[in-house]
Amino acid sequence: MNIILSTFIFGMGDDFSIFIMEGLLYKYKTGKKLLDPHKTAIFFSAFTMIVGIGALVFARHPALHSIAIITILGMFAVVLVAYTAEPVIFNAFVTKPTSQGRPPFTLWAILRNIVFYIPPVLGSAFILLLSFVAMLVPAKKSSRQAAIGWMLHRACRILVGYAAFIHPKRIGPDGELIRSWNGEAGVIVANHQSSLDIIMILATFPKVKFMVADWVLTSPLFGVISRFLGYYSRSEGYEKSLERLRVDVADGWCLAVFPEGTRSLNGKIKRFHKGAFYLASQVGVPVIPVVFYGNWRIAPKNQGFNMTEGIAVTEVMAPVSTISAEYHELTVRISSLVKAEYAELCRKYDSPVNPYFRKALVSSYIYKGPVTEWYVKVKTKMEDSYSFFHSVLPREGRITDIGCGMGQMDFMLSMYCPERRIIGIDYDADKIAVAQNSWLLKNLPDLEFRCGNASECELPESNAFVISDMLHYLDPQAQEALIRRCAEKLLPGGMILVRDSDSENAKGQKVTALSEVFSTRILAFNRTQGELNFISHSRMETIASTVGLKMTVRSNDAVTSNTFYILKF
């Protein structure tokens, strides 16, 4: 009997945990509280069980007494676990990282990160052991340092190469990809984004020493290696560093310095301090500017274990001579060079070619329902991460997306170009709630979502309006009225980008109509208030002419009748 009762209590504990998880997930998805009512229901359920069966504790029969004890202890245990353990775990792996603007943890991400960190720890321990052995080898210290430095270089190259979620690109001064730096020695200055920067420098430069904080030299694992290799301390003073730097450069070593002094939280380059440039100018060695892109997204500051997939660029620029150069002027000039090149890398890789953006977008919809997650994965794949929208729409200015759904396109366009000020409008309050409770919004201050009917809500003045896959939900009169209202709010040089069907394409229209049947009637993913009204190319051209706009057309694909209608003054 006790076994049967224990099994029953265990089953109730499962139900309690499901209720708690449902409340946690609902708040994470929509921002609305459902947990408190669930907790109340759990309390009364447990209370009824304890009072009803737990009262048998006063019975004198040993079997009834035993049943009561098991009930009381069991119910207290399952309620305690449901009330405490589950919220704590959910907060640690979902709520906390997303509140800091990072994706939630998944089991795969945790295992992947563990696998990534095991080799560096074991490799560091092995190199630490070799450092002790090297101290006993009867050879020149510079030769022993070079051997250990070469091992670090090879180990970091292997580490970056086997980490499948890191897509490294090492670019030389001529713009070509390089395996490692084989140029002259000098002082390396680089923007500082992440702890990955150190690994990338070690993977690029075979002989390099770092300017580090004192705690690095005294740390238990890396301290011995750092001291053996002769890393520079910030507190040792310029004069001592100058003497050492002359010897090291003559021996082929580079000195790596991060002139910002700290890692950037958002990738933006801060003011360069002058110390590294003073050292280079005093010794007369060139400054080697290095530009990092993407590391802050893959392994951000204070979030090194919550890594994401993405492109990591290490660009080594042409060495800058310091002969007859004043270090103040040198600081300003190289800072401008690094910032300009970083901006160019952002223009190139803040785009659909970088897998980070799609991975980040999908991660913002996990734990929000399997249908939602599946839809976003499939939709972004079909849209090629919204590459066409990104290429056509302005890179800055106000963009209004009418019929934004859950906002996946708006998130992507905002991540590609933070200068875009985007407003997403949709009349489905549930979808807007999902969009408004995405962790991505914490990193995109110029993106907002509003719930409203496109036919009635006030439209803001915009540089571009996007009406994608929603025009056929309106009747013909409302379609023309909406485009007219957009044209009236269009700023000079602006555009209206419409994607909808071309009902004159008979073959493709059958596929488009069938897909709408699935989305509106079978899956009921999209809400509609009436019959669907698919627009034609000729009618769209008539509307554009009526509102005083010129229209160009581009087919969306070869299967459906979906067509891009680009309307401009």
Regions found by a protein language model. Name each.
Residues 131, 135-151, 182-237:
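Catalytic core of membrane glycerolipid acyltransferases/transacylases, capturing the structured
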Residues 106-167, 224-225, 371-374, 521:
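A transmembrane-helix-recognition feature enriched in membrane-embedded lipid enzymes
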